[in-house]
């Protein structure tokens, strides 16, 4: 009996140990996800602060300066204010569509961050079709905007939702064709493989030099996808008050505000990954892969810093464009997408395909 009791206790202890291992395994699954979300939130707060400071400098005025040092906590203060504001609903609107629309817009953009490689193999989901997963997920966001416009039962909101859907369709196709050209050059649809393909020749191996036409088209299309000036027709204040956001208040309005900057950040990250070499530094005799092999923590940290430095450099261009170019008319916007960018991007894809065939 004593031997039997001892055996039972031993088995129970092993069962508890296995249970603890399963619990720790589940915890470690969520650690990268929460770390990525925390990093995204921090990045959005920095973008908001940068845009306000750069805009203040362009307009020769003083930007935010009271909330925290240099006003860096102003975005956090604005978010807290929106969190405690009342959520109003249109009396004749469609409550399910009105409530779900902002969530769809934010979640679809957040999922796109899962395929971004911030450093050497530091990616949440290294998929073989990572780049097309981003395109597929990002095409869901306009559905949320259209639902918000329709569910508001407001003519300005509905027109804003229709404009957002039309604009997204018009510029999604040229953007996809540019991504196809990059995939042909890299022989892969994985974001990690695309970055590694650019690291073979250093600075001159960046796709920026191999695909200059595609880079310009991707830049214009990504600005249109983010609905930034001069492509902010879905929320044109002079015409539509606030577009599909007109009837929103409180945290739901804040979700649209966050979605705008999340989209801007993800577009800049994809420009870095697809055209600017990702985490690779273009200094002779210095390789991130060698640094990573010597010291993984140091190499990973340097890779993250390089990726974010390139991303925020591109963000400066996007922010400066807002105060440089006037807003297009709706017919001009659609003509630019369908009559100019689409044929040029298609021709660029055919040239890239021909080059790859002749180089075999």
Curated annotation (Swiss-Prot):
Record key words, sorted: Chloroplast, Membrane, NAD, NADP, Plastid, Plastoquinone, Quinone, Thylakoid, Translocase, Transmembrane, Transmembrane helix
Principal location class: plastid
Membrane-spanning intervals of the chain: 27-47, 98-118, 129-149, 165-185, 203-223, 248-268, 269-289, 297-317, 340-360
Cell compartment(s), UniProt: Plastid, Chloroplast thylakoid membrane
Name used for this protein in its record: NAD(P)H-quinone oxidoreductase subunit 1, chloroplastic
Gene that specifies this protein: ndhA
Top-level EC class: translocase
GO-annotated cellular components: chloroplast thylakoid membrane
Role description: NDH shuttles electrons from NAD(P)H:plastoquinone, via FMN and iron-sulfur (Fe-S) centers, to quinones in the photosynthetic chain and possibly in a chloroplast respiratory chain. The immediate electron acceptor for the enzyme in this species is believed to be plastoquinone. Couples the redox reaction to proton translocation, and thus conserves the redox energy in a proton gradient.
Membrane topology: Multi-pass membrane protein
Family annotation (Pfam families): NADHdh
Reaction catalyzed: a plastoquinone + NADH + (n+1) H(+)(in) = a plastoquinol + NAD(+) + n H(+)(out); a plastoquinone + NADPH + (n+1) H(+)(in) = a plastoquinol + NADP(+) + n H(+)(out)
Known partners and oligomeric status: NDH is composed of at least 16 different subunits, 5 of which are encoded in the nucleus.
An MF annotation (GO) of this entry: oxidoreductase activity, acting on NAD(P)H, quinone or similar compound as acceptor
